[in-house]
Amino acid sequence: MSFEVIPAVDMKGGKCVQLVQGVPGSEMISLDDPVEVALDWVSQGARTLHLIDLDGAIEGNRTNAPIIKKIVEKCKPQGIYIQVGGGIRSFEDAATLLDIGIDKVILSTAALKDPELIKKLSDEFGSEHINVALDSKNGKISIEGWTKESEHTAVEMGSQFEEKGAGSILFTNIDSEGLLNGVNPKPTEELVNAVTIPVIASGGVTTLEDIVTLKNTGAAGVVVGSALYKKRFTLTEAINIISDKN
């Protein structure tokens, strides 16, 4: 499987936003139409879209559900793979998204509180459709929209969720997220080496060199948000630099 650069479309209040370290009210970027943003990434070469419902993650409501459905309707016919996270707290939440054509659901807090949920979803829908998000701050996993810290490390939880049937892991280094200060590859590399399922990296990408650095950890891909929206580089440039290195 080739390394993939995946643009993030984070939604809050019906808009596409980028937060600093996930903090509500810290919007660096706010664009009116997430559907247009998604289509723009597709036009630039995106094969996968990473959609995050921040209202779902922070407050538990599904106000962005109609937008997600519209993105699916516009992008799926073009063969685009869509993964969605944010506020998926139950089997029913995940099933609803998978039923409308989402390819992969991303669970975080719900998985940490009830690891058996991953097994149930994997048994029902197949592990390739189930991703667990591990968000690390100061070496420990954060939950509930990054507002609380757990006692567990990413390596501990990654191994546990692989056993439960997760098909992939999204690993975010919150210490770097949204700051545009560059990446620390070590935590990603440690997790990649601890599990056999694909790990998608996230957090802190600022330059094209950061993308190459994360590729070299053995990660399967990288989610990029702030750097693209701040025009540090284009998605096409990011895709091309990976192609050049393959």
From Swiss-Prot:
Superkingdom assignment: Archaea
Annotated SUPFAM superfamilies: Ribulose-phoshate binding barrel (SSF51366)
Principal location listed in the UniProt entry: cytoplasm
Signal sequence extent: none
Pathway(s) of this molecule: Amino-acid biosynthesis; L-histidine biosynthesis; L-histidine from 5-phospho-alpha-D-ribose 1-diphosphate: step 4/9
InterPro entries membership: Aldolase_TIM (IPR013785), His_biosynth (IPR006062), HisA_bact_arch (IPR006063), Isoase_HisA-like (IPR044524), Isoase_HisA-like_bact (IPR023016), RibuloseP-bd_barrel (IPR011060)
Subcellular location: Cytoplasm
Keyword line: Amino-acid biosynthesis, Cytoplasm, Histidine biosynthesis, Isomerase
Catalytic activity: 1-(5-phospho-beta-D-ribosyl)-5-[(5-phospho-beta-D-ribosylamino)methylideneamino]imidazole-4-carboxamide = 5-[(5-phospho-1-deoxy-D-ribulos-1-ylimino)methylamino]-1-(5-phospho-beta-D-ribosyl)imidazole-4-carboxamide
Active site (catalytic residues): D10, D135
GO molecular function, one term: 1-(5-phosphoribosyl)-5-[(5-phosphoribosylamino)methylideneamino]imidazole-4-carboxamide isomerase activity
Keyword flag Isomerase: yes
GO terms, biological process: L-histidine biosynthetic process; L-tryptophan biosynthetic process
EC main group: isomerase
Enzyme Commission (EC) number: 5.3.1.16
GO cellular component terms attached to this protein's record: cytoplasm
Family: Belongs to the HisA/HisF family.
PANTHER family in the cross-refs: 1-(5-PHOSPHORIBOSYL)-5-[(5-PHOSPHORIBOSYLAMINO)METHYLIDENEAMINO] IMIDAZOLE-4-CARBOXAMIDE ISOMERASE
HAMAP family to which the protein is assigned, alphabetical: HisA
Protein name as annotated: 1-(5-phosphoribosyl)-5-[(5-phosphoribosylamino)methylideneamino] imidazole-4-carboxamide isomerase
Organism for this UniProt entry: Methanococcoides burtonii (strain DSM 6242 / NBRC 107633 / OCM 468 / ACE-M)
Originating gene: hisA
